[in-house]
Amino acid sequence: MRRHATSGLPFRSRTQTGIDVVTTEEGDKPKMTMPEPGPGSAAAALAAFRADLPLKAPNARSLAATIENPGCTARRVLDSAGVDKVALATRIGTPLPQEQSVFAINRGNRFEADLKADDYAALIELLRQAKFEVDRVEILRLRNLYPISPRNPDIALEKRAAATRSAILGMAAGESSAPNLIDGGALRWDFGGAVARLETDGIAWRLGGRIHIIEIKSFPLVDGRGDPEKVGAAAWQAAVYVSAITDMLAEQGFDTNLVSTEVLLVCPRNTSLTPTMAPLDVARQTRSLRRLLAGRRQVGDVLAALGDDATLDTAGMSAEAAATHLADVLERLGTNYLPSCLAACPLAYHCRDRARATGNPACLGPEVRTSLAGVQSLPRVLELAVGASPGAGESDAAAMLMRAARLLRAADSSALVDAR
């Protein structure tokens, strides 16, 4: 099989650490055109479903959040169709406030800029401490090669994906011209019948003879530990990258063990902006990801089952009618609100309102939802607690609720006796 290494005009420099660095920024760029969805194709069905809502391709963070909530079919379809969920939430009338403060964004940008200054000297030093082969580092700088335009980001991501694929296959084939560090790599990944374009922070090669994902985050690591929720989100995000590269190698007949499930997490140390790196094992998340995807219906099948009227097209509708229609489409697709959605999904306020209005136990958290498995509403919880006959699937929850009710009555009786 013929493979092409990414071509370009390299130039050499030396970092403050004395490491020989070769970067590629200019030269012949692989050509790729955007595929047009054919009539009757899954892409055409998704485009018709999206209607006039802005196109926003899912990234690894949004996919990770989708995968963490496998019961939410609506979110998976929206991601597959490239629906801008912020715009959708605004049309429904329940927009979320800005997710991150300007200070946090600026701090993150400064940290990443410092990390990559002087030909990535700080990052290379961290890699060297991790036994990365850094006598000669060849960096493929795809952010410089293909800067993303706000007007049409997909074109740049497609070109980055082509260059990243060529470079990774070159790594796997052991080509001497293959880079050993990719900045701004992009990956194409099929999930449930739709293709996502993913932008990575970094991909490192030849660390223990394997390909490693570099995940750069601005939250601090204190004594080598970070906020569990943020580290967990980073692990899921990195697992998406690992899975995408694994699939790429498998398709071309390469050993998938070339991709390490140990991710290199780079964060500020303590309260400073000094970078530190810690290994992050995402093997569990990668396995869970495979199981979840294997059991899912294809997105095209979901849309076909709903009928032709299940689209986000609101042309000719008043704002109120449009909001009602969009909310109805989400309900038909199937939502699954969890409190964690507030930190991960722009539609969380809408779904929380619906969950509260219908008395969905999920609005009280995943632990409560798990404990009340089989019970569909909070009013039904109260009925079971006072002795209502349990229906199908409600027996375990009913027994637990009745025990809890007896304990509460006993506690109330004891309190009355003490008061006297």
Question: Can you name each region flagged by the protein language model?
Answer:
Residues 38, 156, 160, 291-295, ...:
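Non-membrane alpha-helical secondary structure
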Residues 271-333, 373:
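A broadly conserved sequence feature marking short terminus-proximal activation segments
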Residues 356-420:
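C-terminal non-catalytic accessory extensions
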